[in-house]
């Protein structure tokens, strides 16, 4: 662009003029009217111009308002500052009018001509006083000959490019020759536009569609140096070319320009009619107006195709428009054209009916498209909908149409004439989709126009799969759908490689050769490539990376310290303190990796190692159960903990899997969050017969009546729901009794006393002399706000009652001392000496003691439903007994309370205190019984009753044992039919059941399970059924550990912990072993094979750990990188010399490829000599 083009026209009076109506002028004050008549701001800034009509009115005296209201409003709408362009009646101005018009741009000229009354005195005066101005920039007729695509609007005030307006999405809508070039008119601007690649593409597109356009624009395409030369004009020079005004895409007035017959199109006239070539170019706009009418004007500039835009903007494809003819073809509609996507938040805002409607519509669209076209890969959205998984995407831009284009638009495909025949054959050789192949040579650029000059924001061209990569990287393979790349060496050795690698999970783009090069030089990939399959007759060996003993010894200190931090839920800042403590004992600790960031990274690899082992055991388990525990952490973030109950060999395990934050606390929100978390962890929960139980905590959303169980049963029909999560049962019971007035008062009084002593160390020390247990409990419950119900803690109530006499005497002494503190103590002493309060605390101890055995039974790892039922039955009996007679603690109170005194201290007893106590006591007991019935008995599936048949203590003896439990076994087998072998025989199952009863009588349930599972050859059907029964979640020990761990980790001081770090810490704290039993070597090896350990380039070999055979094979590395099995040798491998101990972790030079690398025969890594 010429430098002068960016300049701006001088400011004129019309640019800053404000016209008022008569009614508006009357409202102004005299000072405001005088200010309106001042012309001191504009006159000194430029050359002298004609005195405007407005100031002449001020000079003559009449009021300067405008004429009629309608005429005034019409005038204001045509003002140059408004949206619409002014009207110029005639371009061929004669005489003095043309002379005066040369000093103004077309907009100004049009405006002044509209103001004139026919006498022309304004323009004449203007021209007479402004003869020194430069020659104006006006529209020249020769431009229409030089630029065949140039057209004008009806008012003759703006220029347009007919080719670019035909394809508005190709060019930025804000381009001047698309919106309307209104001046200052320069031929350089037209030349610059003619040379632009977007314009050239539009010209080629029109030429490819219509041969008449091709003939007219042949001169533009053929000579690449001068694309503007044209042998003949497209339009006549005698008449201007008209184009409908208005915003881009507004074709309402196009009908006025269209002729009534085809003959008019073929016979261009010379009387100012529209040329046939132009009308043929726009003949299909009416159909486009109908099809695109449902879209708003803002949607008109949506790109027809991402690949087309990138082809235009790609600098590497400059010659494309000159050499390659463009062919337009209507590609078949694909699913992406009619798909609508939602983000996670937007999906959560939909109700159940809207989600079901969305699922039905998407499935119907896919089925319709599948019936109309050839078979194609099933879209990921449809797969998610069929699995009833959450269909939201992670794109934060919200709902979108497929890949960014609305349905029904045409795709434009550019192909070379010379390669037309060979393209079909080459496309079969390219391991990528056709769309990706077309987009491979393209890039995109986005033009943005801000307050200043135009800025161009360029984006990189889209990356596609290249054929040359498969020759450059022999290990590179592609999936059948041709959308993902994999490393064939790494996917065959998943235990050696980090599964988070993109080329192990599936590389889906953006495809870059740098990613492949980076993967090729990684330690994990080289280890996988340098291993070969052992001969089929030799036992399989486990290959592990060989790390120097010095490196392993140094890193063990860091990983042990990091594991201790995570296991005990300590702050991450304590990591450096632990290392300093180790160093003070004489342990050699490296100077690096001593900060919080390094500790977080080590915990990450520790947790990933634990998770990998757990998930592998879960996938190998014959059946599993899912346990859900909803909670709200210290940051008030609602989340759901997911646990898995599974078999590890012959042992039942419960492990924490993840803590998923909830975006919506509804049944749909829970379901989609849980399904997404399980899918992300690659847990095959949809496999028929694999998931047998669903344990919930009984909350409103997770219960059977909440709808979540029904949603899971749609995916897993045989799922057995169990309300099993019962951690802190006593807290839940007191919470259920929270509506009772006496319970709330009791809890409030205890909190008041505790806060009174916590606020003063002096009073706390005085209390310690006679009430040591209470003083210790007050110190332990330092943060009372974190305790929901203090009255639910048996330990707190017991300490309060034991220390009650000393507490009352101390409060009496403080009250006698007087003052403000004494007044507070006097009020608390009155509460502590209340008969109602003291006796109800004794009753609460008896009440909570009944729930303790039931809570302990529910926290066992292996427990039979009969044991839970027996404990539950005893709890019902104890509660009924407590309802009618006093418990042990209450009897103790009755025995000690004599003559209105308890332990020598007088109690304030009201006349109706005993009656109120008995009423509240019975109400509390009934509420507790109702809670247990709702918690354990409501909606209880009959299969749990059938499982009681495995309680050997309830088996009959003699002949009755032969037919005992047959119906229960058959009912269980029919319900869990998917978990048993296909076509099993019920007679064979009953025979196995009879055999088990003869050998396992009087055995406890745990021994019965181990015997049945160990003898799976003898009991092939019954062992599988027994595994299902054991997997049903009855106990909740893992949920209890996870609940406590989360409260220790995310406290009020650590509310900003991310969910990723929280999951890492909980994975280690819940699933980890004791610190003294932890082996850090697997985590160190995992760290060593990832990017964090890549800086340590030690001798890169792999040590073989034989599985069965004691003989170890040697691996030899040849020049080409291939390995083969070699006979054992006695020659020792070359070992790199070691430097000083402080330089152990520095990079070492790798052995040359022609050298042989041998692993050591021993399990221990070689030391650095």
Swiss-Prot record:
Its main location: nucleus. A zinc finger (TTF-type) spans 135-218, 461-544. It is linked to Fibromatosis, gingival, 6: An autosomal dominant form of hereditary gingival fibromatosis, a rare condition characterized by a slow, progressive overgrowth of the gingiva. The excess gingival tissue can cover part of or the entire crown, and can result in diastemas, teeth displacement, or retention of primary or impacted teeth. GINGF6 is characterized by gingival overgrowth beginning in the first decade of life. It is found in: Nucleus. One of its GO terms (cellular component) is nucleus. Residues 11-77, 333-404 form the KRAB domain. GO terms for biological process: regulation of DNA-templated transcription. Pfam families: Dimer_Tnp_hAT, KRAB. One of its GO terms (molecular function) is zinc ion binding. Keywords: Disease variant, Metal-binding, Nucleus, Repeat, Transcription, Transcription regulation, Zinc, Zinc-finger. Transmembrane segments: none annotated. The lineage of its organism: Eukaryota, Metazoa, Chordata, Craniata, Vertebrata. It comes from the Eukaryota. SMART domains: KRAB, ZnF_TTF. Changing residue 938 to T: In GINGF6; likely pathogenic. It comes from Homo sapiens (Human). This is Zinc finger protein 862. InterPro entries: HATC_C_dom (IPR008906), KRAB (IPR001909), KRAB_dom_sf (IPR036051), RNaseH-like_sf (IPR012337), Znf_TTF (IPR006580). The keyword Zinc-finger applies.
């Amino acid at each position: 662009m010429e430098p002068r083009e960016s300049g701006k026209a001088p400011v004129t009076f019309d640019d800053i003029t404000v016209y008022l109506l008569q009614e508006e002028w009357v409202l102004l004050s005299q000072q405001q009217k005088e200010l309106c008549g001042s012309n001191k701001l504009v006159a000194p800034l430029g050359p002298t111009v004609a005195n405007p009509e407005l100031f002449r009115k001020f000079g003559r005296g009449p009021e300067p308002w405008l004429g009629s209201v309608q005429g005034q409003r019409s005038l204001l709408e045509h003002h140059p500052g408004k949206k619409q362009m002014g009207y110029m009646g005639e371009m061929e101005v004669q005489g003095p009018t043309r002379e005066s018009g040369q000093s103004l741009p077309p907009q100004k000229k049009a405006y002044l001509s509209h103001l004139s009354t026919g006498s022309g005195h304004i323009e004449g005066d203007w021209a007479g006083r402004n003869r020194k101005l430069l020659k104006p920039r006006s529209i020249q007729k020769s431009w229409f000959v030089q630029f065949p695509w140039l057209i004008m609007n009806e008012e003759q005030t703006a220029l347009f490019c007919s080719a670019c307006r035909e394809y508005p999405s190709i060019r930025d809508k804000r381009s001047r020759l698309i919106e309307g070039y209104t001046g200052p008119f320069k031929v350089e601007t037209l030349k610059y536009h003619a040379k632009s690649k977007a314009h050239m593409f539009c010209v080629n597109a029109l030429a490819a569609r219509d041969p008449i356009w091709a003939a007219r624009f042949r001169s533009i395409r053929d000579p690449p140096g001068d694309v503007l030369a044209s042998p003949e004009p497209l339009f006549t020079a005698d008449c201007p070319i008209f184009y409908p005004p208005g915003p881009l895409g507004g074709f309402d007035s196009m009908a006025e320009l269209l002729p009534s017959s085809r003959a008019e199109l073929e016979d261009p006239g010379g009387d100012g009619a529209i040329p046939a070539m132009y009308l043929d170019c726009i003949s299909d706009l009416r159909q486009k107006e109908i099809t695109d009418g449902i879209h708003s004007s803002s949607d008109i500039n949506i790109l027809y195709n991402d690949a087309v835009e990138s082809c235009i903007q790609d600098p590497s494809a400059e010659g494309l428009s000159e050499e390659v003819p463009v062919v337009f073809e209507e590609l078949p509609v694909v699913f992406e054209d009619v798909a609508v996507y939602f983000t996670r938040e937007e999906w959560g805002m939909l109700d159940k009916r809207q989600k079901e409607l969305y699922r039905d519509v998407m499935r119907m669209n896919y089925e319709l498209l599948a019936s109309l076209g050839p078979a194609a890969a099933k879209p990921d959205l449809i797969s998610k909908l069929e699995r009833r998984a959450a269909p939201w995407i992670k794109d934060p831009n919200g709902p979108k149409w497929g890949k960014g284009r609305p349905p029904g638009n045409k795709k434009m495909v550019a192909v070379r004439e010379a390669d037309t025949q060979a393209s079909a054959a080459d496309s079969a050789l390219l391991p990528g989709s056709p769309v990706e192949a077309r987009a491979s040579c393209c890039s995109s650029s986005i033009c943005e126009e801000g307050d200043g000059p135009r800025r161009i924001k360029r984006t990189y061209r889209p990356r596609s799969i290249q054929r040359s990569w498969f020759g450059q990287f022999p290990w590179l393979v592609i999936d059948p759908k041709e959308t993902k790349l994999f490393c064939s060496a790494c996917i065959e050795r998943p235990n050696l490689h980090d599964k988070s690698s993109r080329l192990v999970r599936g590389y889906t783009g953006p495809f870059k050769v740098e990613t492949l090069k980076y993967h090729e030089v990684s330690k994990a990939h080289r280890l996988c490539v340098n291993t070969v399959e052992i001969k089929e007759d030799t036992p399989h060996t486990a290959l592990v990376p060989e790390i120097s003993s010095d490196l392993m010894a140094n890193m063990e200190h860091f990983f042990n310290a990091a594991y201790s931090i995570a296991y005990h839920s300590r702050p991450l800042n304590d990591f450096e303190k632990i290392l300093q403590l180790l160093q003070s004992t004489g342990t050699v600790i490296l100077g690096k990796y001593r900060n919080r960031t390094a500790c977080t990274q080590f915990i990450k690899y520790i947790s990933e190692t634990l998770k990998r082992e757990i998930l592998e055991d879960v996938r190998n388990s014959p059946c599993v159960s899912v346990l859900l525990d909803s909670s709200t952490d210290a940051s008030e973030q609602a989340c759901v903990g997911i646990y898995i109950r599974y078999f590890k060999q012959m042992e039942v395990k419960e492990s924490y899997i993840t803590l998923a934050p909830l975006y919506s606390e509804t049944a749909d929100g829970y379901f989609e969050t849980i399904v997404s978390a399980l899918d992300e962890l690659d847990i095959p929960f949809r496999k028929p017969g694999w998931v047998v139980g669903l344990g919930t905590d009984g909350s409103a959303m997770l219960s059977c009546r909440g709808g979540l169980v029904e949603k899971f049963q749609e995916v897993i029909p045989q799922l057995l729901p169990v309300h099993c999560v019962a951690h802190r049962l006593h807290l839940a019971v007191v919470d259920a009794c929270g509506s009772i007035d006496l319970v709330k008062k009791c809890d409030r009084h205890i909190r008041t006393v505790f806060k009174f002593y916590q606020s003063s160390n002096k009073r706390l020390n005085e209390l310690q002399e006679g009430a040591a247990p209470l003083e210790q409990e007050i110190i332990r419950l330092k943060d009372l706000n974190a305790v929901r119900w203090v009255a639910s803690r048996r330990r707190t109530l017991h300490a309060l009652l034991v220390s009650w006499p000393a507490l009352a005497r101390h409060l009496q002494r403080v009250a006698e001392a007087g003052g403000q503190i004494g007044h507070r103590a006097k009020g608390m002493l009155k509460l502590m000496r209340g008969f109602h309060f003291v006796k109800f605390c004794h009753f609460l101890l008896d009440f909570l003691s009944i729930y303790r055995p039931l809570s302990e039974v529910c926290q066992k790892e292996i427990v039979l439903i009969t044991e839970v039922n027996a404990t539950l039955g005893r709890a019902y009996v104890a509660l009924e007994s407590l309802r009618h007679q006093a418990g042990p603690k209450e009897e103790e109170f009755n025995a000690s309370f004599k003559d209105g005194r308890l332990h020598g201290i007088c109690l304030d007893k009201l006349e109706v205190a005993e009656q109120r106590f008995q009423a509240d006591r019975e109400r509390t007991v009934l509420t507790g019984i109702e809670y247990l019935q709702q918690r354990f008995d409501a909606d209880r599936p009959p299969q749990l009753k059938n499982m009681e048949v495995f309680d050997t203590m309830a088996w009959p003896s003699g002949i009755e044992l032969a037919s005992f439990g047959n119906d229960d076994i058959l009912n269980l087998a029919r319900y869990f039919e998917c978990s048993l072998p296909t076509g099993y025989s019920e007679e064979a199952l009953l025979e196995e059941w009879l055999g088990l009863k003869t050998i396992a009588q009087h055995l406890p349930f745990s021994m019965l399970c181990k015997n049945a599972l160990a003898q799976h050859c003898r009991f092939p059907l019954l062992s599988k059924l027994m595994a299902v029964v054991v997997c049903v979640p009855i106990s909740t020990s893992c949920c209890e550990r996870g609940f406590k761990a989360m409260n220790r980790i995310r406290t009020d001081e650590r509310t900003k912990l991310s969910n990723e770090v929280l999951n890492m810490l909980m994975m280690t704290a819940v699933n980890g072993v004791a610190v003294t039993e932890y082996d850090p070597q697997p985590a160190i090896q995992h760290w060593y094979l990832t990017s964090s350990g890549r800086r340590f380039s030690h001798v890169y070999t792999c040590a073989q750990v034989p599985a069965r055979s004691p003989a170890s094979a040697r691996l030899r590395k040849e020049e080409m990188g291939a390995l083969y099995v070699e006979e054992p040798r006695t020659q020792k491998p070359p070992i790199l010399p070691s430097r000083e101990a402080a330089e152990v972790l520095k990079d070492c030079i790798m052995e040359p490829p022609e050298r042989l690398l041998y692993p050591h025969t021993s399990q221990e890594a070689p030391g650095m000599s």
